[in-house]
Design a protein with these regions (language model features):
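A bilobed periplasmic-binding-protein/Venus flytrap-type ligand-binding module shared by bacterial periplasmic
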Residues: 130-137, 172, 243-256, 274-277
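A ligand-binding cleft/hinge motif common to bilobed small-molecule-binding domains
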Residues: 90-94, 205, 209-230, 279
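Short alpha-helix C-terminal cap/hinge motif
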Residues: 43-59
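Mature extracytoplasmic/periplasmic domains
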Residues: 250-304
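Periplasmic-binding protein-like
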Residues: 114, 127, 183-187, 193-194, ...
Length: 327
């Protein structure tokens, strides 16, 4: 009998422990790989949010930003994500059409170069696309000058990468109906096309290309983290394309309250102060930028297609790009 009582007590302890674990709510956030990396914003944001939510915040990487949309379209209502973080305005119209997202209910004074009134997609950072190169590389200030040069570049695939898709929108915004010819002329300059930003940037750092498609903020990483001021970005005369990255709440999440809390957290200093020195982008709300950001290239002009226009032209631009580079 004594042995049986001990056994029951042990089982009771295990059940209590299991119940305690089960009561810890979990919020799943689907995002891009670099956000979850040890050098990305994910770890610091996870620590900060868990300290105030008594929850488990789980980030899941799904490739680069554009791959998020493909995964959502595949999973539909079966997704276990409560938050999707890492789409941009070139994808939000298509994402909205999935019917997966609910209004975020967050109000904030955003520091974006464009007006923002979207009640579903909440901006968490932004930046200008640009080609990043060594300072001693002769700069170019237009796509035409780049195509006419001997410079070698690395870009990202627009089907899986938001910077890659942004480049297509940028070329389209500048060259319109002549964009397909521009891609044909650029083909000789392109060393390779990578699935995502990380692979492309690493090839540039390895000396495989003269320049890489990235952001005007990318040199800040080298300056601040490595004390290296040898990198720069190029402002184009016609303007540089703007990227605004967003988060959204999944409508059918079983952690509605926690998801709402995290969406509000995104627009707080605890989240936003992490962005400049981990995601190396501009924060979406007023905050103090680190020393070194004041040295960055600031384009004289920014350009951004509306989310609906981007959705309308996306497939055609991707097909024209694919055709030009396969010739």
């Amino acid at each position: 009998m004594k042995i049986e009582l001990l056994g029951l007590a042990s089982v009771g302890a295990i059940l209590c422990a299991s119940t305690g674990l089960a009561q810890t709510p979990t919020l799943n956030v689907l995002t891009y790989d670099s956000f979850t990396s040890e050098w990305g914003p994910g770890p610091a944001i996870e620590t900060a949010f868990e300290a105030e939510c008594a929850c488990d915040l789980v980030f899941t990487g799904a490739g680069d930003g554009a791959a998020l949309l493909a995964r959502l379209q595949l999973e539909g209502m079966r997704t276990d994500a409560g938050i999707v973080l890492g789409l941009d305005t070139n994808l939000t119209a298509a994402a909205r059409d999935t019917g997966l997202f609910a209004p975020h209910g967050v109000t904030s004074d955003f520091t974006l170069p464009v007006a923002w009134d979207d009640d579903t997609f909440l901006p968490f950072d932004w930046g200008y696309l640009a080609f990043v190169a060594q300072k001693d590389t002769p700069p170019v200030t237009s796509f035409r000058a780049l195509a006419d040069s001997d410079l070698k570049i690395v870009i990202q695939d627009p089907r899986s990468s938001t910077p890659g898709l942004g480049l297509l929108m940028w070329v389209h915004a500048v060259h319109g109906d002549e964009a397909a010819q521009l891609w044909t002329d650029l083909a000789d300059n392109i060393v390779t096309v990578t699935p995502g930003w990380t692979e492309a940037y690493n090839l540039f750092l390895a000396g495989e290309a003269d320049a890489v498609l990235s952001y005007t903020t990318s040199p800040a990483y080298h300056l601040i983290a490595e004390d290296d001021d040898t990198k720069t970005s190029w402002a184009f005369d016609a303007g540089n394309y703007l990227q605004v990255e967003v988060a959204a709440k999944v409508a059918n999440t079983d952690q509605t309250g926690l998801a709402d809390r995290f969406m509000a957290f995104i627009a707080s200093p605890a989240f936003q102060d992490v962005i400049p020195e981990t995601n190396w982008m501009y924060p979406a709300i007023p905050t103090t930028l680190p020393a070194g950001f004041d040295t960055l290239t600031v384009p004289a002009k920014g350009m951004l297609l509306s989310s609906q226009e981007a959705a309308d032209v996306r497939d055609g631009l991707v097909e024209a790009w694919r055709t030009a580079l396969s010739q």
